[in-house]
């Protein structure tokens, strides 16, 4: 019995030594990986810090005065009205994205296409409003793609 316990101790010593030798490189590798991750985060922050419109974040507030000026010159919006409109736009876009995602899921696809977005808009907005929104969105997409093609030709 003493021999069996001595063998058990010897085998536990070798496994603990092996475990220590294995753990040391993992710790060294993990610290290197953590440092690289930290460096990557800092670099990406610097790159995106100079992006235009970054001070507004995910807000549409800078666009409301521009659109209002095109539609009704001389009018202005209160801060409360801007806040309400901003939350409304966020809500509508969230609903469209959710509905388009569900449509893509129903057809067993992982990519949301422009057709999914068109159908989501038609489902969410009633009657003429849906048709008008779809037409405006299609025209905006065409203008954007035509501008991109025009820039490539230059």
Swiss-Prot record:
Keywords: Chromosome, DNA-binding, Nucleosome core, Nucleus. It is found in: Nucleus; Chromosome. InterPro entries: Histone-fold, Histone_H2A/H2B/H3, Histone_H2B. Residues 34-50 have a biased composition (Basic residues). Residues 1-18 have a biased composition (Low complexity). Core component of nucleosome. Nucleosomes wrap and compact DNA into chromatin, limiting DNA accessibility to the cellular machineries which require DNA as a template. Histones thereby play a central role in transcription regulation, DNA repair, DNA replication and chromosomal stability. DNA accessibility is regulated via a complex set of post-translational modifications of histones, also called histone code, and nucleosome remodeling. In contrast to other H2B histones, it does not contain the conserved residue in C-terminus that is the target of monoubiquitination. The nucleosome is a histone octamer containing two molecules each of H2A, H2B, H3 and H4 assembled in one H3-H4 heterotetramer and two H2A-H2B heterodimers. The octamer wraps approximately 147 bp of DNA. Belongs to the histone H2B family. This is Histone H2B type F-M. It comes from Homo sapiens (Human).
């Amino acid at each position: 019995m003493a021999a069996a316990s001595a063998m058990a101790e010897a085998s536990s010593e070798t496994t603990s030594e092996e475990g220590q030798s294995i753990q040391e490189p993992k710790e060294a590798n993990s610290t290197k990986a953590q440092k690289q991750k930290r460096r990557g985060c800092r670099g990406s922050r610097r790159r995106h810090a100079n992006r235009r419109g970054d001070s507004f974040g995910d807000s549409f507030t800078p666009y409301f005065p521009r659109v209002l000026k095109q539609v009704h010159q001389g009018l202005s919006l209160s801060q409360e009205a801007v806040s309400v409109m901003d939350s409304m736009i966020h809500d509508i876009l969230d609903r469209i994205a959710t509905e388009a995602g569900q449509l893509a899921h129903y057809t067993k696809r992982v990519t949301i296409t422009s057709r999914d977005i068109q159908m989501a808009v038609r489902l969410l907005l009633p009657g003429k409003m849906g048709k008008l929104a779809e037409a405006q969105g299609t025209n905006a997409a065409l203008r954007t793609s035509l501008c991109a093609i025009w820039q490539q030709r230059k």
